[in-house]
């Protein structure tokens, strides 16, 4: 005779086994395969950001209210962040880049925490935050690396490469290694935190629906915002380091 409690344990383990990592909905584009679910949610995120920008600036007022007030607050926050990390002289041209990085990661992270993507069925895998995919975070990290290389080289020219042998040529291997570790740390930090948060919430919802996961979901929202801030701050700091004049 089968014990009912054993059946309950079996059903619970079966539900947990459905919490999967690495499932992808592939799109075939020529000879390349792309992660379709990442593109779908990325388009959703970009639509939110663009819509907010349009609604916040379509009828500008001297005394901002509503959406315009919110957009101006976000812009001031990003501007202050860039100014602090990059410096008064060079920050203005980098505000759009830092703002785009911050907003994309922030909205992506929150979309994964707030939007019930699991209710939308796709042929394979499941929809989730774009930052839940290592390809997205790696692309953002590489874009940041290219940006600070460009920032330093465009301002200093060939003098930029002097930083690799300063204050002594002995540090050349370490300085070169640092350029490889920066994008790695950026991408894996963001990917690991977002993936872990979604997995923990997914498992707890399976075990104890609604009651226990709610505080963790709220904590996840806070963590998601912090991760966006950390990524944008480090990106701005790397650019500031590249354009800084050493005397």
Curated annotation (Swiss-Prot):
It comes from the Eukaryota. The keyword Glycosyltransferase does not apply. The chain crosses the membrane at residues 36-56, 95-115, 134-154, 199-219, 220-240. One of its GO terms (molecular function) is proton-transporting ATP synthase activity, rotational mechanism. Keywords: ATP synthesis, CF(0), Chloroplast, Hydrogen ion transport, Ion transport, Membrane, Plastid, Thylakoid, Transmembrane, Transmembrane helix, Transport. One of its GO terms (cellular component) is proton-transporting ATP synthase complex. It holds the Pfam family ATP-synt_A. It is found in: Plastid, Chloroplast thylakoid membrane. Gene3D superfamilies: ATP synthase, F0 complex, subunit A. It is a multi-pass membrane protein. InterPro entries: ATP_syn_F0_a_bact/chloroplast, ATP_synth_F0_asu, ATP_synth_F0_asu_AS, F0_ATP_A_sf. F-type ATPases have 2 components, CF(1) - the catalytic core - and CF(0) - the membrane proton channel. CF(1) has five subunits: alpha(3), beta(3), gamma(1), delta(1), epsilon(1). CF(0) has four main subunits: a, b, b' and c. Key component of the proton channel; it plays a direct role in the translocation of protons across the membrane. Belongs to the ATPase A chain family. PANTHER family: ATP SYNTHASE SUBUNIT A, CHLOROPLASTIC (PTHR42823:SF3). This is ATP synthase subunit a, chloroplastic. It comes from Mesostigma viride. The gene is atpI.
């Amino acid at each position: 005779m089968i014990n009912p409690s054993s059946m309950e344990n079996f059903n619970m383990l079966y539900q947990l086994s459905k919490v999967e990592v690495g499932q992808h909905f592939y799109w075939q584009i020529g000879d390349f395969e792309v992660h379709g679910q990442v593109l779908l949610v990325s388009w959703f995120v970009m639509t939110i950001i663009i819509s907010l920008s349009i609604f916040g600036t379509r009828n500008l007022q001297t005394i901002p209210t509503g959406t315009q007030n919110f957009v101006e607050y976000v812009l001031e926050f990003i501007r202050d962040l860039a100014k602090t990390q990059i410096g008064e002289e060079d920050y203005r041209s980098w505000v759009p880049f830092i703002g785009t990085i911050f907003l994309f990661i922030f909205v992506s992270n929150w979309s994964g925490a707030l939007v019930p993507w699991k209710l939308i069925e796709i042929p394979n895998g499941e929809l989730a935050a774009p930052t839940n995919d290592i390809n997205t975070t790696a692309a953002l990290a590489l874009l940041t690396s290219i940006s600070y290389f460009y920032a330093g080289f465009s301002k200093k020219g060939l003098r930029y490469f002097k930083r690799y042998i300063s204050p002594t040529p002995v540090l050349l291997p370490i300085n070169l290694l640092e350029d490889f570790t920066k994008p790695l740390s950026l991408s894996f930090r963001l990917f690991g935190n977002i993936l872990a948060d979604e997995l923990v919430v997914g498992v707890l919802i399976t075990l104890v629906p609604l009651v226990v996961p709610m505080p963790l979901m709220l904590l996840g929202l806070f963590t998601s915002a912090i991760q966006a801030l950390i990524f944008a701050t480090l990106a701005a700091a790397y650019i500031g380091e590249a354009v800084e004049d050493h005397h």
